């Protein structure tokens, strides 16, 4: 570690603040317009400037309503002072022994296999069953029949378990050392999530409500495409994580190459806290380099842990080298350890463990564990790491908003105290045997069976008839659930993302990020349409925000949209199995979009006179290109800059509604318009003839007038494609990607196989699965995820525009 790096590390530590949810997690829309219908959150990096008095004053001067009577140079707003609840000693003790953890990774990294071992070692299940149902049982967390058939996780599954582990490092008293204290029982809520990109919403909503996560990686494949996506989701919600390098028994496993990928590809400050004893088929255990102890799994299915100070000579040098590397990496993330390191003072195992906990919970470091879930090795030390290094609910600050205050008002910290007013978030819905099953994270207060709770979105008061804790598809009835817990309710009608309170507060929390669908296809029942067809589509839409249904206005076909072919195939199959409705589907369609590349002004008057009261509305302004907000996914906006009363306030929502209607159907190919901001600068109204309809039509006409002047283009979804195949087929694979007009981003060769990363238009990827199987003799595999929308080639846009024009003329 250079002197400059050491100094920089110390400066960074002096400026580091404790772990706090970022603006997105605090659900804190900080910029809103009094005339707009929705808040437009700014990026978290702008939080400091937004909360300054100068910003608030300039904000008020610029955005005050035309009808407001605010004086010149608005005064600084004063917000209500609140007395926050306090944690009792009972709460503190309970929360210190509570963990809410998700297990996420790329597909086939071993998440569900790992969760199965966790459940077995914690005593939640009596025997271990494998993922693909080879023993006709299947893994506990893959409870859906389709999951066991296909060997993949489709829905996230929740469970809970108790684990006895040593006291966390930061709770150690004087004279106590890490790992040598009395063991205590920890309650762990676990959510196992899908690894396939098509089911990314399951990962999204799980991470929204969790306090920590385990990122599982394959010791051979390392960081893969969905690993990058999961890492991005964890960063979006500021979720501290541990990394677990699985499949250490596989040929070609190299954990330190994977750690290098974590640092290089994910820009993660990560280091191993273990080194393997043996490699590949000889993998026998791990060395805990924090305490310098060898750990082996013995007994029936590895249920006995044997620790010894006798580290095999073959790995002693490696263990000492990686321990020094761990201390150096960790000293850049923890000020206390950095001081010891720079002063060349003795560093004890307790010093390292305490620094690991501080740096992990504050998102500055990721400890890396190793093992093989399928070989029952290394799972128990990982559980100890979850209890030692991941935060408890009281160490993560969650925020709520007051629905009675403007959206830019300060957020309210939620305190996980049992006697505080109830605040909970419904993050997932399922259709259970006894009605709707609503998964809930309780952030504050206590939720009791039979109690009355309020839906902050609808204002409705509902009763909780049944309260359960989930164990995959099994349920355990409970009378009450306290702050920090995850549970499920029966018989409560709501939507995903709804906030519930006990009625004593007006708090609300915002929901999770929902990506837009990228693929669509038409669907109809094989025979006569039955009520079950509509019932199934309605249910699937309610459960999955990324599954959309609409009826095409021209063909009158029912169109379903989702995140990929597999996503839609699963729902078609579920419709057949669960509702006995066999369906016929059309050819998949790509979700094309239209956008503008330049700003364009408009000055449009809508006038209609037919005797008596007519219609009059004039709007002046511009449309501008707009980047997608990476935190909220919002890519369209309406901005009112009118100062004065040229357009009465009651007509502004009608103008915004007209803008939203105009976005539904583009002028080049008829596809929805995205990436566009509507700026209203001025206009005029008529005392008699102006009404909402007139201004709505004026907005539509103005948008269409300006759209053609703003150099519009057609966009298509582009996918990041990752292909893994034997090295002898590399030439064929590259040739096929070039044939599909793909752009090769990266190629990595290891041993006898290679990994190719490319960006290819989704429209050019249809049929690739069969082609890859044929050219690699069935040995190649690929995965793809949505990257962004990019302009189509000019000749393609011309063809699409001509086809759309002919279609319109033929009507």
Curated annotation (Swiss-Prot):
It comes from Cryptococcus neoformans var. neoformans serotype D (strain JEC21 / ATCC MYA-565). Pfam families: EFG_C (PF00679), EFG_III (PF14492), EFG_IV (PF03764), GTP_EFTU (PF00009), GTP_EFTU_D2 (PF03144). GO terms for cellular component: mitochondrion. This is Elongation factor G, mitochondrial. HAMAP family: EF_G_EF_2_B. Residues 96-394 form the tr-type G domain. Residues 1-64 form a transit peptide. GTP binds at residues 105-112, 192-196, 246-249. Keywords: Elongation factor, GTP-binding, Mitochondrion, Nucleotide-binding, Protein biosynthesis, Transit peptide. Gene3D superfamilies: 3.30.230.10, 3.30.70.240, Elongation Factor G (Translational Gtpase), domain 3, P-loop containing nucleotide triphosphate hydrolases, Translation factors. Belongs to the TRAFAC class translation factor GTPase superfamily. Classic translation factor GTPase family. EF-G/EF-2 subfamily. Its main location: mitochondrion. GO terms for biological process: mitochondrial translational elongation. SMART domains: EFG_C, EFG_IV. One of its GO terms (molecular function) is translation elongation factor activity. Mitochondrial GTPase that catalyzes the GTP-dependent ribosomal translocation step during translation elongation. During this step, the ribosome changes from the pre-translocational (PRE) to the post-translocational (POST) state as the newly formed A-site-bound peptidyl-tRNA and P-site-bound deacylated tRNA move to the P and E sites, respectively. Catalyzes the coordinated movement of the two tRNA molecules, the mRNA and conformational changes in the ribosome.
């Amino acid at each position: 570690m250079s002197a400059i790096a050491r100094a920089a590390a110390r400066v960074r530590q002096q400026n580091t603040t404790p772990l706090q949810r970022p603006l997105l997690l605090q659900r804190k829309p900080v910029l809103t317009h009094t005339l707009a219908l929705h808040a437009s959150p700014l990026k978290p990096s702008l939080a400091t400037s937004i909360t300054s008095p100068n910003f608030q004053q300039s904000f008020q001067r610029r955005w005050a309503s035309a009808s407001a009577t605010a004086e010149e140079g608005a005064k600084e707003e004063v917000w209500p002072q609140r007395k926050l609840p306090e944690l009792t000693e009972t709460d503190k003790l309970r929360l210190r022994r509570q963990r809410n953890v998700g297990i996420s990774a790329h597909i086939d990294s071993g998440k569900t296999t790992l969760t199965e071992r966790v459940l077995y070692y914690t005593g939640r299940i009596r025997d271990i069953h494998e993922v693909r149902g080879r023993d006709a049982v299947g893994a506990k967390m893959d409870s859906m029949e389709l999951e066991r058939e296909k060997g993949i996780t489709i829905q996230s599954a929740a469970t809970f378990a108790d684990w006895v582990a040593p006291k966390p490092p930061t709770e150690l008293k004087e004279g106590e050392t890490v790992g040598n204290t009395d063991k205590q029982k920890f309650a762990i809520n676990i959510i196992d999530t899908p690894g396939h990109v098509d089911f990314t919403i399951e990962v999204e909503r799980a991470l929204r409500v969790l306090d920590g996560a385990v990122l599982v990686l394959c010791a051979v494949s390392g960081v893969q495409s969905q690993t990058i996506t999961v890492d991005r989701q964890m960063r979006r919600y500021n979720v501290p994580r541990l990394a677990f390098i699985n499949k250490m028994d596989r040929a070609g496993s190299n954990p330190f190459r994977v750690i290098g990928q974590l640092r290089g590809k994910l820009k993660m400050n990560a280091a191993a806290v273990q080194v393997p004893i043996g490699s590949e088929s000889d993998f026998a255990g791990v060395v805990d380099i924090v305490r310098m102890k060898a750990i082996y799994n013995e007994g029936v299915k590895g249920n006995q842990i044997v620790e010894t100070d006798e580290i095999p000579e073959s790995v002693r040098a490696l263990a000492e080298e990686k321990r020094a590397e761990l201390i150096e990496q960790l000293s850049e993330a923890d000020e206390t350890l950095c001081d010891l390191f720079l002063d060349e003072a003795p560093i004890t195992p307790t010093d390292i463990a305490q620094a690991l906990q501080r740096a992990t919970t504050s998102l500055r470091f990721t400890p890396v564990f190793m093992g093989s879930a399928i070989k029952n090795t290394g799972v128990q030390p990982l559980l100890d790491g979850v209890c030692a290094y991941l935060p408890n609910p009281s160490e993560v600050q969650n925020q709520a908003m007051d629905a009675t205050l403007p959206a830019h008002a300060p957020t309210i910290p939620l305190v996980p105290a049992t006697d505080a007013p109830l605040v909970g978030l419904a993050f997932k819905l399922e259709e259970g045997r006894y009605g709707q099953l609503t998964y809930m994270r309780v952030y504050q207060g206590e939720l009791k069976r039979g109690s009355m709770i309020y839906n902050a979105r609808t204002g409705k008061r509902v009763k909780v008839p049944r309260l359960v804790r989930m164990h995959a598809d099994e349920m355990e009835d409970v009378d009450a659930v306290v702050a920090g817990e995850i549970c499920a309710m029966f018989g409560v009608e709501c939507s995903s993302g709804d906030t519930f309170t006990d009625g004593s507060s007006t708090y609300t929390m915002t929901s999770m990020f929902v990506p837009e669908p990228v693929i669509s296809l038409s669907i109809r029942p094989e025979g006569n349409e039955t009520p079950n067809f509509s019932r199934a589509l309605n249910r699937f839409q309610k459960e999955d925000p990324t599954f959309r249904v609409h009826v095409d206005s021209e063909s009158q076909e029912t169109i379903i949209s989702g995140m990929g072919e597999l996503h839609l195939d699963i729902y078609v199959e579920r419709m057949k199995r669960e509702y006995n409705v066999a369906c016929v589907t059309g050819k998949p369609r790509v979700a094309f979009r239209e956008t503008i590349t330049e700003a364009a002004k408009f000055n449009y008057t809508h006038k209609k006179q037919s005797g008596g009261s007519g219609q009059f509305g004039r709007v002046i302004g511009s449309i501008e290109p707009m980047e997608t907000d990476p935190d909220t996914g919002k890519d369209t906006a309406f901005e009112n800059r009118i100062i004065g009363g040229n357009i009465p306030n009651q007509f502004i929502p009608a103008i915004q509604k007209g803008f939203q209607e105009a976005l539904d159907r583009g002028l080049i190919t008829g596809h929805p318009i995205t990436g566009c901001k509507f700026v209203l600068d001025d206009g005029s109204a008529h005392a008699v003839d102006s009404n909402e309809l007139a201004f709505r039509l004026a907005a539509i006409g103005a948008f269409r007038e300006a759209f053609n002047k703003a150099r519009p283009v057609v966009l298509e979804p582009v996918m990041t494609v990752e292909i893994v195949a034997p090295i002898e087929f590399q030439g064929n694979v590259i040739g096929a990607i070039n044939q599909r007009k793909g752009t090769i981003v990266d190629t990595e060769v290891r041993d006898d196989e290679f990994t190719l990363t490319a960006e290819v238009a989704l429209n050019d990827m249809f049929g690739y699965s069969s082609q890859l199987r044929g050219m690699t003799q069935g040995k190649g595999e690929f995965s793809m995820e949505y990257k962004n929308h990019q302009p189509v080639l000019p000749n393609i846009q011309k063809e699409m525009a001509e086809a759309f024009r002919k279609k319109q003329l033929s009507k």
